[in-house]
Swiss-Prot record:
Gene: rutD
Annotated GO CC locations: membrane
Protein name: Putative carbamate hydrolase RutD
Origin species: Escherichia coli O17:K52:H18 (strain UMN026 / ExPEC)
Entry's EC annotation: 3.5.1.-
Family matches, as Pfam families: Abhydrolase_1
Record GO terms (molecular function): hydrolase activity, acting on carbon-nitrogen (but not peptide) bonds, in linear amides
Disulfide bridge positions per record: none
Lineage summary: Bacteria, Pseudomonadati, Pseudomonadota, Gammaproteobacteria, Enterobacterales
InterPro entries in the cross-refs: AB_hydrolase_1, AB_hydrolase_fold, AB_hydrolase_sf, Pyrimidine_utilisation_RutD
Family named by the database record: Belongs to the AB hydrolase superfamily. Hydrolase RutD family.
Purpose of the protein: Involved in pyrimidine catabolism. May facilitate the hydrolysis of carbamate, a reaction that can also occur spontaneously.
Length: 279
């Protein structure tokens, strides 16, 4: 994948390594694109790993005007190039929804670099229900603009009782999201890239270990999508959270973090040990 000079300058946020040669974990958010999505995971991850967060191209502190044909492959290529420029050659990926798609693309295109993948509420190709949800959200965007999109978004991310107990927090988050809205064109081009992505014929070529985490009450992405992903991948394990919704890492971080840390410890460290034995 060819990267333009502007794309090559994508900014990353790197935590200090907790010890020499600490494994690197790259966090990739979903359609919103903001690295701050992973705030509930940072403190625990940074104790064991060097953590990379970033705002995706066209969002936050990486502003840009995206091409109409912008793709998941481009998202993967520009991230990999930014990591290489930062001196990072091997890394694990934790991706949420769209971020999980980018993670799979990285594993396919740069197999020598990706040590492990964690897919959070991801999929092989977009499910009919997920497509329907996005059609409704697109209609809201076209008819009501950014404010309608932002105000509807929590309905697809969080369980109803969790939202009801946190109304002031959600109002504050809505205001922040509206102030930092990525723009209609960029959002639609990123969404179209998500909808076009199809790994159903390529997932069996992903050789790194994959941890799959999903929530059974996810309104946007049915948990069956993670089951299909699990069946298609050669080396994967699947964990199901009974509660948490699409943004389960935000709504139930204690449970999610425990699953994530255990998965990284068992799969990533096992893979690294095996690689060292081969050297």
């Amino acid at each position: 994948m060819r990267i333009s000079p502007s794309e090559a300058a994508m900014k990353l946020s790197l935590s200090p390594p907790p010890y020499a040669d600490a494994p690197v974990v790259v966090l990739i958010s979903g359609l919103g694109g903001s690295g701050s999505y992973w705030l509930p995971q940072l403190a625990v991850l940074e104790q064991e790993y060097q953590v990379v967060c970033y705002d995706q191209r066209g969002t936050g502190n990486n502003p840009d005007t995206l091409a109409e044909d912008y793709s998941i492959a481009q998202m993967a290529a520009e991230l990999h190039q930014a990591l290489v420029a930062a001196g990072i050659k091997r890394y694990a990926v934790v991706g949420h929804a769209l971020g999980a798609l980018v993670g799979m693309q990285l594993a396919l295109d740069y197999p020598a670099s990706v040590t492990m993948l964690v897919s959070v509420n991801g999929w092989l190709r977009i499910n009919a229900h997920t497509r329907r949800c996005f059609q409704v959200r697109e209609q809201l965007l076209h008819s009501g603009g950014a404010q309608a999109w932002v105000e509807a978004q929590p309905l697809f991310l969080y369980p109803a009782d969790w939202m009801a107990a946190r109304a002031p927090r959600l109002e504050a988050e809505d205001a922040l999201a509206l102030a930092h809205f990525q723009g209609k064109n960029n959002l639609l081009r990123r969404l179209n890239a998500l909808k076009r992505a199809d790994f159903s014929h390529h997932a069996d070529r992903i050789r790194c270990p994959v941890q799959i985490i999903c929530a059974s009450d996810d309104l946007l992405v049915p948990s069956a999508c993670s089951s299909e992903l699990h069946a298609a991948l050669p080396d994967s394990q699947k964990m199901v959270m009974r509660y948490g919704g699409h943004a389960c890492n935000v709504t139930h971080p204690e449970t999610f973090n425990a699953l994530l840390l255990n998965g990284l410890a068992s799969l990533l460290h096992h893979r690294e040990a095996a690689c060292k034995e081969l050297l």
